[in-house]
C-alpha cells in the first residue's frame, strides 16, 4: 500500500532483488536500457537475464530518446526495459523520473526504478522519489533495499499482481534462497510502519 501497487515481493537482500527481478522481466529477445551510472547489482541482473544490455548517458534524456528510437526502429515490437536509480548511490543525483516516464510510455517500454536511496527519505509518506514527483502509478517496477533508511536487511519489488506472480515462480534468487527469518521480517514491517507514520514524516524534515 505504501508504494500504491497491486502487489510486492520481498527478497533476502537488495542485490538478490536486482538479480531476480531483472532476470524475470527480460530474456534473450529483449533489451535492457540502463543509465550508465546504475548500481553494479542492476548491471549484474541485466547480464544474468541474457538480454542485450545497452546504456544511455547519465540522466541525459536526449541520449535516452535516441537509444529508444534506435531500438524501436530496429525492432518495432521488441521488449525494452528501461532501468534507472531514483537517487544515485555514488553521487546523490536524482533521476528526472517525469521525463523518463514520458519517454518509456512514448516508446512502449517497461520501466524499473531502484529506490534504494529514495525509500524512507523522499515523498510525503517516505515511499521515495517516485511518490515525491507523483509518478508512482506510471512506473512498472519500484524496487529497493531495506538496508538503508529502514535499517534492516532485505529487498523488495512493488509491481502489478501479474508480474509479482511471474517473479514468485521464476526469480532464482528468490526461489533458491532462504526466506528472511521471522524476527527480521517483523523488524522490517515495523520499520516500514515508522517510515509511513507521523513520526517518520517528522524525522524526514
Predicted segments — roles?
Residues 1-20:
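Short loop-beta-helix segment that forms the pyridoxal 5′-phosphate
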Amino acid at each position: 500500500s505504501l508504494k500504491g501497487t497491486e502487489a510486492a515481493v520481498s527478497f533476502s537482500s537488495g542485490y538478490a532483488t536486482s538479480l531476480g527481478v531483472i532476470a524475470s522481466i527480460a530474456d534473450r529477445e529483449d533489451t535492457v536500457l540502463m543509465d550508465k551510472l546504475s548500481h553494479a547489482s542492476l548491471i549484474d541482473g541485466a547480464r544474468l537475464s541474457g538480454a542485450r544490455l545497452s546504456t544511455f548517458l547519465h540522466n541525459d534524456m536526449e541520449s535516452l530518446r535516441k537509444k529508444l528510437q534506435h531500438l524501436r526502429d530496429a525492432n518495432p515490437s521488441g521488449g525494452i526495459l528501461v532501468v534507472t536509480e531514483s537517487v544515485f548511490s555514488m553521487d546523490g543525483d536524482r533521476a528526472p523520473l517525469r521525463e523518463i516516464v514520458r519517454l518509456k510510455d512514448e516508446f512502449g517500454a517497461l520501466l524499473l526504478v531502484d529506490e534504494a536511496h529514495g525509500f524512507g527519505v523522499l515523498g510525503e509518506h517516505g515511499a521515495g522519489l517516485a511518490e515525491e514527483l507523483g509518478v508512482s502509478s506510471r512506473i512498472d517496477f519500484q524496487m529497493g533495499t531495506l538496508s538503508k533508511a529502514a535499517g534492516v536487511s532485505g529487498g523488495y519489488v512493488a509491481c502489478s499482481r501479474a508480474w509479482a506472480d511471474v517473479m514468485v515462480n521464476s526469480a532464482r534468487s528468490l526461489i533458491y534462497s532462504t526466506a528472511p527469518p521471522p524476527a527480521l521480517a517483523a523488524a522490517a514491517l515495523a520499520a516500514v510502519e515508522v517510515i509511513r507514520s507521523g513520526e517518520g514524516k517528522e524525522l524526514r524534515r
